[in-house]
Structures are given as C-alpha cells and as structure tokens.
Amino acid sequence: MPLHGKDPFELNKTRVKSGEEYFVIKFTKEHFKRYKDYIDRYELYRQKIWTCSITGKQNLTFEEALLSEKNASEKVSKVSELLLPHCLEFIQYKEITLEEMTNQLYEFLLMNYYPGEIVSFKKANVKYTGRIIELLENYNESDEQSDNEQQKKSSSSSSTTTTTTTPTTPPTTTTTTSSSINALSAIPIPKKEIKLQLYSDDENEEEDEKNNGDTSSDKKGEKEKEKEKEKEKEKEKEKEKEKEKEKEKEKEKEKDSDTKSVRKYVDPRKKLDSIKKYYKIYVDSQGKNFIINIKDIQKREPPIFKPMVKDTIKTVAKKTKHLGGFWEVEPELIKKYNLEGLKIPSSVRKEVEQHLKRKRIADGEILEDTEEESVDIESNDNSNSNGNSNSNNNLDSSDESETERKRKRPKYPIEDQDVDRENEETGKENERPIASSDFFCLSNTFGDFLMVWHFLNHFEKVLLLSPFPLDDFEMAIQHHTETNILVESHIRLMKTIFTLPSYSSGTPKKTFGGKAITDRNWLATLRAYFQNEVKRIAIEEKEKQEKLKQLEEQNIRMLNLANELPGSDDEDDEMKLDEDGNEIKKDVEMKDNDGTKDTKKDDEENEEEEEEEEEEEEEVASDEGEEEWKEENEIITSADANTICKVLKKKNYFKLSVEERIYILAYLVKQTIASEKIRKHLEKNVELGNEVKQEKKGIILEEKQLKQDDAAAAAEDDDENNEDDEEQQQQEVKKPKGAKQKKPITPVVEKEIEKLEKKLEILDEKLEKYSTRLESLGRDRNYRNYWYWYQLPSKIYVENENGGWEYYSSKKELDDLIKYLDNRGIRERKLLFNIKPKYDFIVSQLEKKNKEIIEQIQFESKRSQRIKQLYTEKSYISWENKYDY
C-alpha cells in the first residue's frame, strides 16, 4: 500500500449492500454513498504526495505509486541466495504470526550484513559502494578515532617533509625545535596549573588594558561573562529536564511491558543510531578497506523490501496447523543449506516431536509402540540359542508383513466408495436398515408435498394463511370434496401470483384481480390462470428465439466484415458469374442426356405417389384416434403448465389423483417465490437472523467469561488454603497426567449460567423461525440425503438419488443406521458428526410419537363405531383461516 508522505494509509471500508448505488474508485475499489466524499478522496489520490512503499520513490500520485509497487514486486520477489540460509535459521521453529515474522525478519536483515554483500555507505559526506569482508566484533569508537588520527598524522608528516626540503630553512634548526617541542609535550602538566596559567594570562591582559585606560572594554567583558554564566545555567536546566523526561519514558515503557499493551510499529532504521556494530568494507575504486558503522550503511544491493520478505516466508516455510503452531522450513532447503543441526528450543520441543510423529503416521511409517515391540523381540531372539534360528526368521517375516500393512494404510477420511467395509467375522459389508416408504402418495412426489407444506407454514404472514399440521394437509389433499385447507391454500397462492408485473398490468389485470377470487370461483380462475400461463410461456419462448436469431445474424455480419478485403467484391462477382455459367452448362448437359429417361419414369412415379397418399391418409386417421385417446386419459406427471392446462380442461379437479394435485400446488409455489412480497420478507428475516446471531455470540462470551473468572477465583482460594498441606500435593503428583480435577462452580455463577442458557434456547428458537433454507444432516456413501426437522420430529426422512423418499421412525432403526455408517468416509463422517449431538433429542421424540400412536390405537379399539361417528371431529375439516381477505 502506498504511503501518505511517510505515514501508512488505510482505504475506506464500506459494507456494500445489494440494490443500492455507490460511487466507485476503479484502482482502489472503494465505495462511497455521497458524491462529495467520492470527489474529496479522488482529488486526494490525484495529488503528488504519495510514496512507493517498496522503492521509496516520492512525489507520485496514488495510482503511480501502486504501479511502481507492482513493478518492483514483479522484478524482485525473493531474497538473494547469500541471505537465504540466514533467513531460514531465523524462521525455523518460531511461534509467531505471519505479520510479526515479516516485521522481525525485515528488522533482522536491516541490523545484520554478511560477507560478500555489496553495500553503499557514506564516509566524510562521500558515497562509496563496496563489498563486506567481515564483522569487527571487538571494535570501539576509540579505535576508530585513533585510526583517523593516524591517517591525519600520516598526511601532516608528508606535508612537513616537503617543507624541510626547501633551501631557506637549515636542517639543524628544525631538528632542535622539533626535539624541544617533543620534550615539552612529554612533560606531564597538572590540570590546576594549566588553569592558573590561563587566569594569569588573562590578568596580565586586563592590567595592560587598564593602563591604556580602556574602561569601556572592561564593562563589555563583564557583561559577556554574565551572559555566558546565564547560558550555562540554562543549559544545565535543559539537561536536567531531558534527564527527567528520559526517566519518565523508561517508567512508561516498564508499565507497557507489565500491562502487555499493543505497541505501534517503529521503523527499525531509527534503532540503528543506538547500535554500535562495525564492518570492514573493501572499495574497488579506492583500492583500500574502510571500517564503517552500521548506521552509515545506506542500503544493500539488491535492496530488501517488506513484501519481498513476506513472499520468501510464504514460499520457504509453512506454519503447522495444530494449536500453538510453529514455522517449519521445507526439508529440501534444510538439506540444501546444511541446516539439519539446528537446535530445537525448549519451548517448542514437545510440539515438534508430536508434529514429527503425526507426519510418520500420515506417511504410513511404524508407530513408536510397534518399534519398541520389535526391539524387544530382537533382544529376546539374540538371547536364545542358535538352534532357534528358524523361529527368529518367522518372527522377522511376520514383523515385516505388519509394517507393510501399516504403510499401506490410507489416510482417513477418504472417498466413501473406496473404504474397505468387509466385516472381520462375516466377511461381508454391513447392510443398511430397511426404511419404510408407506406414504399416502408416490415416493417421488412426497418431496414436492413437503416443500409445499413448509412454504405455506413458513410464509403464513405474507400469504395470510393460518398454519396447519402435516397430517391435516395429507388428509385434506386426499379428501374427495372441498376442504378449507385446500381451497384457502390455492386462493392465497394465486393472490400473491397476481401481484407479479405480468398479471398486475395490461389485459390480465381485468380478469386476474386479487379481489375477484373467492371460494366459489377459485376453480374457474385456476383453469383461466393455467391457460394464460401457456400463452405467456409461448410468447416468452418466441421472444427468446427471436433474440437468438438476431444474435446469430449479427455474428454472421461481423464475420463477413472481418473476412472482407479491399478489392474482394469484384473477385467475388466474377467468381459468381463463372460459377453461374458453369452451372448453366452443367444443367444443359444434364437435360440433354436425361431427356429420354424422363418420359419412361413419369408413369412409375405417378403410381408410387398414389400409393404413398393412401398410406398417409390411413396413418393420419390412426394418429388422430390415438391423440384423442391420449388427451382423454392424459395424467399430470410433472409441474408443467401445458399438461396441467390440458387436464384441467377435460377433468374436474376433485377427480384428479393425489399426485396431480400436489404437482399443481408445487407449480403455484414456484411462481409465488418470484413475487416481491416474498423477497422483502426474506430480506427482513436475514437481517433479524444476523441480529440474533450477534446476541448469541455476546451471551456465549459472557458465559465463558463467568466460568473463567470463577475458575480463577477458585484457584486463588486453593493456593491460599493448600500452602501447608503437603499430603494433598503428594496425592496430586501421584495422579496420572490426563486426570484433571474439575473445580465446582459457585451457586451464584450457576444461576447466572442457567439464565444465559435459557436466553440461548430462546435465541435458537428465533433463529429457526428466521431461517428459510432447510439444511440436511448429510449424505451416505450412495449419495442418499438424510433430513430431520424440528417441525416434524417423529421421523428421519431419506431422499434417494432418483428423487424417491423413505423414513425411519424408531430408535432401533436409528441405532442400526449409525452402525451402518462408517467414520472413515468423508460424507458419512460428516453425517455422523451432525447426528450425534441431536441423538438424544431425536430418540426422545421418536419414542414419544410411538407412545402416542399406541395410546390412540388402544383408545379407539375400546370405542364403538356409533360413538366414533357421533363424537369424532376431523381437524382438517374443522380448520378455519384466521386471516381475513
């Protein structure tokens, strides 16, 4: 991401909602609702204030900075091979995130340089490029200053030698003066004497000035001294303030370290000023070595950037997937750069061992237990006599066969069809429990029936239709006369369909008004609706075909235009004339040759035509009879408007079979889904469902926090009470590692947790109401789909690949099904995972339903037929819709 000057910049993040309009910036894909915000951000991107985060180029627009970053990342995507082994050492066995790893590795590479690298640096305000020779570990600033002084002395000595060679100065005088100076410089003078000498010199000067009568200069000197004293005092005060600030900063850092607060990322280049690390660098142009501090090194060639470091980490290493994962370098690179001897840190040693064990198991290698057993067998065999060599060979062969089997074991879960399901006792596969399919209709149409019932009950407020149980709906469809459930469901569905634009505008609006439908004319409107549907579908198909023809014609024209060349029209015309001429000639030749044959064949052709006409008349008559018979006996076999329209013209609705009625309702439901009312209701449910999910997350977090706080308080109490109890500590040590004592929860916390659990149950019920899409439990090896709904708790439904339906309705059948399913397959593992948490609830509901059925049968067996006829009211007949028209 480009930098705003030198600071990082964040893009605008807006949640895009479907159906709303936004102003979008193309190169950032930012969405803005207000035009003003869009213009302000676009003008900001046009300003030349952006810098490339990779190359460091400045004074760019945002788009130019993005392009420079893209080009730079394409050119250099990995660290050089010279630095790669050092990077691998740094990455191996680290327990940090990818972002932390990139920051730390980038900082590590800025702080360290290695022999052989080409580097640019500054020395005495002059830029040089050279090659690093070595790191000087025991090197100080004093050594650097002495080296600089030696260089200066060497330069000054060269200048003095040039002056001594001149004829004006004799050699003797120079030697004496130099020797005397060296002798004086060798004498040690104390600091106090130096100060006294300075003061004495100043006093002599002052006396001379007094003698000269310069009184004005004395006053000026005193003022200057006073000013200097004041400046010194101010400097001392500033130093004291700086020290106090540094102390405060150190205290703040200690507080931050204690509280473990998140710190802002600091540029590692700023840390180089405090580091004292020196490198010996050889410069080819100068032909000599330079000793340079790390802060004076400007950059290495090729340069290193953060995106490059991130890409190298991704390509070179991978983080283990288990909890508390660490970074692991690819084994090929470890062998290539001889990094096999890297020490594993103590904090990660157990995790590394477990990870290696998992790898061996996945690859099919021997487990630790089997290895130990094989070692014990070998030791026992060696202790035996030589006469038992045959038995040893047999044991070795058996061990080899076991190891081969373990290596051949596949890594589960695998494809369900590939799982070997042969039972060791019987040698056959376990059979699936037989499911019952004694529905009131065909098993292929039962899925449509369930879909219609769920739709009518779920969208009751939109359709204005009171809910009803599945059993009543079954009986209402089977009934030979009108029932309120059947009539109201048809009316409410058609009313929502007539709100569609194809029926609410134009000529259909007059005949298909929502208010015109009643319980008296609903059958007539149903027939008229399907007649209109047939016409509408035919018109739509014609429009589609016309559009396809137009597209084909456009494509042909475009191809012809593309194939045309300059001067090709004349050639085409000539070719056409030639072709026409040839054809004419051929036609003439054929007429001359075949003129004699035509007269002979005329009589034969006339006879054949008469025979064919007679046969066609007979076939037409038979076809018409067959069509009439088919139309009379035609059956609705699918939710198709044409077949439904034909059947409703010739048959009464209540003479139709149950399957035909289900297909009619299924077609009406599919049409109502496209209405605007249903769409708005779905959007509201999605929003409300998201709100409930957020509330649920908050309650779960509260519950976790309560348990953690209670556990922490209990642990503190235990530590205080058990300080002097050595016996309890010894007992805890003797316990196995896996046994963990669950500390009891306090009664106050228990009450709060119960309240939260009740809230969660209420929220789960709300989510079920707002969820429109039904989800299956899963699939088995043969792709059968298993369904369970809380609205229909008495059965587990099974949907086959062909569309047929079955069900299980007892605990024994469910247990047999769980035994039949295999955990080693992908699909069946998921199915078992979804069944197990719901097992207790499903079993309780199945048993409850079976008890109710038994009680009902026993109760009805005691009653006489006369009492049954008098006092039994059928609920599907007495049902009434609470919503008004």
UniProtKB/Swiss-Prot annotation:
InterPro entries membership: DDT_dom, DDT_domain, WHIM1_dom, WHIM2_dom, WSTF_Acf1_Cbp146
Protein name: DDT domain-containing protein DDB_G0282237
Coiled coil (residue ranges): 217-260, 530-565, 593-628, 674-782
Biological source species: Dictyostelium discoideum
Domain DDT: 443-503
Low complexity compositional bias, start-end: 154-180, 380-396
Keyword Signal: no
A single Gene Ontology CC term: nucleus
Ranges for region Disordered: 141-184, 201-264, 367-431, 562-632, 707-744
Pfam families tied to this protein: DDT, WAC_Acf1_DNA_bd, WHIM1, WSD
Domain WAC: 20-125
Subcellular location(s) of the protein: Nucleus
PANTHER family on file: BROMODOMAIN ADJACENT TO ZINC FINGER DOMAIN, 2A (PTHR15546), DDT DOMAIN-CONTAINING PROTEIN DDB_G0282237 (PTHR15546:SF2)
Keyword Nucleus: yes
Biased composition (Basic and acidic residues): 210-264, 578-603
Predominant location category: nucleus
Biased composition (Acidic residues): 367-379, 567-577, 604-631, 715-729
Keywords: Coiled coil, Nucleus
